[in-house]
């Protein structure tokens, strides 16, 4: 053994060839943390000092190569001054450079995935051989930063600036065949031939058949583009990528700027450019928020996994209520491998549900994400029925009938008598109390809420609602089923609106106040979209359905009359009474036309102004900043209340629920991280400026205490 550490070993294989193996003890994956980087430095020094070494293979002892840097260390590192961050990056890069500069040929054998720093390690090798099942990529832009271990320097010099920009700016994982096509890897082999393929390459380099020094040289030099080619390549790319990423996500464009700035430099000087840009991005609020989201997501996955121990396996599911929602749930279950019965009392509803599932599967086939054979398999896994004849073996039933408590209670009581005693019943309600619905059941311990968001196939969140009598097994089984469906489940306790809708309706409440104060709803939409929401509140209400919003608001007003009840008529009342229900019937705040692709397109309709005129009670002058605060303060305060009331267990779950459930701007990190970014004391002072707007704007006593003590929601 030439070197042995806790993350890396170097051992002799044959004929002077050694294997540098990443295998981080106590972890399921390899990642670059302080320990791994330090051991890489020591391992390279040990190889350098051993005169018998003629070639090096870099491999992994795990199912994946290296997943990247240890993100948990980012949080502390990114608090350092910018100059220290630059110095730290350059120090790490000296280690990669030392590996790249070894006097012997080096080959990376890539299995599983090599992402971020994992791929950057491979780029420092002379050759790369990749398993057919492996994927590689530089996903750093998704964290608000760009590659910092030489990715913006080596990749453009290896595969050309155009290809490198595409890889870095998109941040996606790339398959072996695509990597080979652009020259990111030198060979692709079957997984079982990876070691042999790497050995073959290194032997050919040792024998002189391959000139590894010539292969290495372009990575050490400036980019092979003249001034005109540089201008055309980089300026065009910046314009295109800026349009794709938008103004709130600067990392992709900054990555291109870094490549451009370093184009005329050799490796070492180019790495200095990369380090400076990386440190600058690391200090931005966008990076802090996106890294926070990543860590929150990991926390969510850990919490969901903890339910696996007691969860029952769901081998057969059922959905009650077909139509668009039922069809979406059936599709999601079937496409992820759980057969499902789809029951309704009407043949036309069954047909609608089947059409929805078939359309979604067809879309996946068109995009190459599913084979026709797999589509047929998924369709066969959805069994439509008008009776309970096949319900005896069902493990979980998702009730998705009309949002009416009496109808839901009747349907749930009926199906309870048709399933086995330990079958789980789950209601896909968006606002109705689970405790109320449970009163109709003989086995309330087997009953939970399972709130999907529309459209089911696109929205990643599922709220699993724990009622007073819900058993932990029922909760755990529902969480496991949601995960199996490819969703991100969050367990919340019962209350009107649960987490997401309880928080969303105060946001709509702020919107209603603005419209009643004479503020143009089109302007409000533009301001909130610029703030980062995927759509403004008026457009969102139209998409959700004015009738759905009207019903939800009444439920919330009944549940929280002190702050959510408003005796005055609102914009939603006016539209509802005028039968302007939004996209579903072609008119809401906006009117809707069909575009070339057959999708609804919103257009301004002046007749809505007459409908809204009676609910405009004043003409108040407000700034764009006021609009943001009228909307965001009540949303944030209600999120705080949900955390304080124990509706949601952690700040991480609260924020992720809003990002996954209603499209809260990811670059702002969620409502609680948004408060942190302003400062808790500053946020309380901000809310107090709008206290005259009512109780929705009044901070809780506990939040005031946090402000006084200088506390935060996230460390």
From Swiss-Prot:
InterPro entries membership: 3-OHacyl-CoA_DH_CS (IPR006180), 3-OHacyl-CoA_DH_NAD-bd (IPR006176), 3HC_DH_C (IPR006108), 6-PGluconate_DH-like_C_sf (IPR008927), ClpP/crotonase-like_dom_sf (IPR029045), Enoyl-CoA_hyd/isom_CS (IPR018376), Enoyl-CoA_hydra/iso (IPR001753), FA_oxidation_alpha_subunit (IPR050136)
Sample GO molecular function, one term: enoyl-CoA hydratase activity
Signal sequence interval, chain numbering: none
Keywords: Fatty acid metabolism, Isomerase, Lipid degradation, Lipid metabolism, Lyase, Multifunctional enzyme, NAD, Oxidoreductase
Annotated transmembrane regions: none
Gene Ontology CC terms: fatty acid beta-oxidation multienzyme complex
Positions bound to substrate: 297, 501, 660
One Pfam family recorded for the sequence: 3HCDH_N
Record has Ligase as a keyword: no
Sites where the protein binds NAD(+): 325, 344, 401-403, 408, 430, 454
Catalytic residues of the enzyme: 451
Catalytic activity line of the entry: a (3S)-3-hydroxyacyl-CoA + NAD(+) = a 3-oxoacyl-CoA + NADH + H(+); a (3S)-3-hydroxyacyl-CoA = a (2E)-enoyl-CoA + H2O; a 4-saturated-(3S)-3-hydroxyacyl-CoA = a (3E)-enoyl-CoA + H2O; (3S)-3-hydroxybutanoyl-CoA = (3R)-3-hydroxybutanoyl-CoA
Pathway it works in: Lipid metabolism; fatty acid beta-oxidation
Region of interest called Enoyl-CoA hydratase/isomerase, as start-end residue ranges on this chain: 1-190
Stretches for region 3-hydroxyacyl-CoA dehydrogenase: 312-715
PANTHER family, alphabetized: TRIFUNCTIONAL ENZYME SUBUNIT ALPHA, TRIFUNCTIONAL ENZYME SUBUNIT ALPHA, MITOCHONDRIAL
Function of the molecule: Involved in the aerobic and anaerobic degradation of long-chain fatty acids via beta-oxidation cycle. Catalyzes the formation of 3-oxoacyl-CoA from enoyl-CoA via L-3-hydroxyacyl-CoA. It can also use D-3-hydroxyacyl-CoA and cis-3-enoyl-CoA as substrate.
Subunit (UniProt): Heterotetramer of two alpha chains (FadB) and two beta chains (FadA).
Protein name: Fatty acid oxidation complex subunit alpha
Species in which this protein is naturally found: Pseudomonas putida (strain W619)
The gene coding this protein: fadB
